[in-house]
A protein has these predicted regions:
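Caspase-like cysteine protease fold
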Residues: 136-151, 265-286, 290, 348-415
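Eukaryote-biased recognition of C-terminal alpha-helical segments
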Residues: 610-655
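Helix-turn-helix repeat elements of alpha-solenoid scaffolds
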Residues: 416-448, 487-502, 533-547, 587-593
Length: 656
């Protein structure tokens, strides 16, 4: 992924945010980077800007606006905005500096104070001299990738929790008297975006409950429907599909979203941004406030500002101001094709764990390249809070999603293998290919620095690849039968060899990783093709045991639990490398049982740590203890000490 080079640009004026019209006579203070403040003006009268924006609405006063006129307005407005931004010396300097960097996305955080400034479509800016891509739209030019988001000024920073398990609410409304909305197309796009994390089932009917755990759909929704849904479920993403409409409040024009008024007597109701924000940020029965991370307003004019004379802003502004970190909206009418592209691009990329700033840039370029989308690229407006640790949160979320995707693939392989016989097992092999490619890509994205954190991250990713190879080997071994038995067993042995070597490589990255070296020893103990090492395997055993014993004294309960899990396994392996003699079996079995009980005492009987350790000893009992009487006695003691769980254990939850 690209690094993000952030430029914060603030445009401010004196006085309240409302009650002022745009005027060339009004000076605005700009703050950018570490440079001194500068002063700019907007060379547009308020009514002139409104007229120009009206001509970008495809139809005005009942008459269609020609494509030529729309393009001319875009060019003229883009040039005006470009001239305004060119008068901010710090912005020009910072963009020039960013142009010399490689593999970087420039992110402009635009913060404005003044409702009249929110009317200005900064997103259509044409790059002036000194900016990348001179003469082209700055946000779609190909020289230097640039993304622009808006942000509301706040008293204190808004917390962002990006790394959450996704749960999507899709609410659409098509009450009587309004034209259809592309609900089916949007639902297909959302369903497709979620596909990598939907567990495989043999029939579509069996998959429906799995989808419903991740996607809630409100048909012809009312505001109360949205409020109830947000009160009972913690959604990470909310996708609203409806028409936008003007409404008059105190004689002033405002924009709202058209929802259904009532299911018993359906009718259109124009809901303003503040009412929608209150529904999205409702308080649940346990006292927690609903807080989606991102809200997509697939409605016309959701980012458009009505009269600047009254408090409040656009729908997107109000939702963002209420505490929603990311709001994706349109400041002009958006085509159906454009709204579908928005849904496909945003959710498929964000759910994969791409940086949302990069997704905004790619989304705008996709809209710009799609002739069907007209000027939807200019309509796209994004309000966003980007804390300093957002990149780290995105990386953590990408790891979560990758592991969850691999969990689903292994579950699919196991379920399919139960039904696959002979040639039918080829479909399972294709799943193995997908697992390997997913983890290969994940490993390739690991940090390359030489610090301890980067090394730990690389070790974890390499270890995940190793664990996958081991799991694949066991699945292959379990289904080695018939004419293909020898080939399947050979593939299983090759997977075990790869797993063993990867575990050793993981330990080489992080010498405190007792889990990786223990798995390396485990596979050397059970795999005929042992690895020749500079140290004897009995010495590696001593190293692993010493590290685990040290970490058993850790104050962190999670680290202690995993250390005891390693100790339980390493004691068993002592018989394989001559560290223990047969007459010590009873004592070692008692010691292993004690370690297993300690794990349950630290983390709980139904904890991930207990379940993962039990699964590992079940492998020894099933696959590797047939000719090892000491192992049989020790695994029996371990399994008796480890409580059984009725909950499933995701494969990547515990990667040994």
């Amino acid at each position: 992924m690209r690094d993000v080079y952030t430029i914060r640009l603030e445009l401010l004026r004196f006085g309240p945010a409302h009650n002022q019209l745009l005027s060339p006579l009004t000076p605005y203070v700009t703050l950018c980077g570490n440079d001194e403040p500068a002063s700019v003006t907007i060379p547009l009268e308020h009514h002139h800007l409104l007229n120009r924006l009206e001509r970008l609405r495809y139809v005005t006063d009942g008459a269609p606006v020609s494509e030529g006129q729309r393009k001319a307005e875009l060019r003229e407005l883009g040039s005006i905005v470009g001239r305004v931004l060119a008068n901010v010396p710090a912005l020009t300097a910072l963009l020039g500096r960013a142009s010399g960097l490689t593999n970087v996305l420039v992110h402009i955080q635009l913060v404005v104070w003044g409702s009249e400034l929110a009317l200005v479509p900064f997103e259509i800016v044409t790059a002036p001299q000194g900016f990348p891509g001179v003469g082209s739209p700055l946000l779609t030019q190909g020289d230097v990738p640039v993304a622009l988001t808006r942000e509301v000024r706040r008293e204190r920073p808004l917390a962002v929790e990006w790394d959450r398990a996704p749960r999507i609410l899709f609410a659409w409304a098509e009450p009587p008297g309004v034209s259809r909305v592309p609900a089916r197309e949007h639902l297909i796009a959302l369903r497709h975006a979620l596909e990598p994390w939907i567990p495989w089932r043999p029939t579509p009917e069996l998959r429906v409950p799995e989808v419903q755990q991740r996607l809630t759909v409100l048909h012809n929704a009312t505001l109360d429907d949205i409020r109830r849904a947000c009160r009972t479920t913690s959604f990470t993403h909310v996708h609203l599909l409806a028409h936008g409409a003007e409404r008059t409040e105190a004689g002033e024009r405002q924009y709202g979203i058209i929802l259904n008024r009532d299911h018993r007597q359906p009718a259109a109701e124009v809901v303003d941004g503040q009412a929608l924000a209150q529904a999205l940020r409702v308080t649940s029965q346990d006292g927690k406030v609903s807080r989606p991370t991102a809200v997509t307003l697939a409605t016309c004019d959701s980012g458009a500002v009505g009269s600047p004379l009254t408090p409040g802003g656009s729908i997107a502004h109000d939702v963002h101001a209420s505490g929603v970190p990311w709001v994706i909206a349109s400041q002009l009418p958006m085509t159906i094709a454009g709204s579908v592209t928005l849904t496909e691009c945003w959710y498929s990329r964000v759910l994969m764990g791409e940086d949302p700033r990069s997704v905004v840039h790619e989304l705008r370029r996709s809209l710009h390249a799609d002739a069907r989308a007209k000027h939807d690229w200019a309509s796209l407006a994004v309000y966003a809070v980007t804390p300093p640790d957002l990149s780290a949160q995105v990386t953590a979320f990408r790891s979560r999603q990758t592991k969850a995707r691999v969990d689903v693939l292994f579950d699919k392989a196991e379920r399919m293998s139960e039904q696959a016989v002979g040639p039918g097992f080829e479909t399972v092999r294709k799943v193995f290919v997908e697992i390997r490619q997913t983890l290969k890509d994940y490993r390739a994205e690991a940090p390359v620095a030489d610090g301890p954190e980067a090394r730990r991250e690389r070790a974890e990713r390499i270890g995940l690849n190793a664990a996958a190879e081991k799991r694949i080997a066991l699945l292959l071994r379990a289904h080695a039968a018939g004419d293909s038995r020898q080939q399947t067993e050979r593939e299983s042995d090759e997977s075990l060899t790869r797993a063993r070597d990867l575990y050793h490589k993981a330990f080489s990255e992080d010498w405190t990783n007792h889990w990786a070296i223990t798995q390396f020893l485990s596979l050397n103990a059970v795999h005929a093709n042992r690895s020749g090492e500079e140290l004897r395997l009995s010495d590696w055993w001593t190293v692993a045991r010493s590290i685990a014993l040290q970490q058993c004294r850790d104050t962190d309960p999670v680290s202690r639990a995993w250390a005891f899990a390693t100790l339980a396994e390493i004691e068993l392996l002592g018989f394989a490398f001559g560290n223990y003699a047969a007459e010590q079996t009873v004592d070692i079995a008692a010691r292993v049982a004690r370690h297993c009980r300690t794990i349950a005492e630290i983390m709980g009987e139904d904890s991930l740590h207990v379940r993962a350790t039990r699964r590992q000893f079940e492998r020894y009992a099933r696959w590797w203890s047939a000719d090892k009487p000491q192992w049989q006695q020790i695994t029996a003691a371990a399994l008796q000490a480890l409580p059984q769980s009725r909950n499933d254990l995701h494969w990547t939850s515990a990667i040994p």
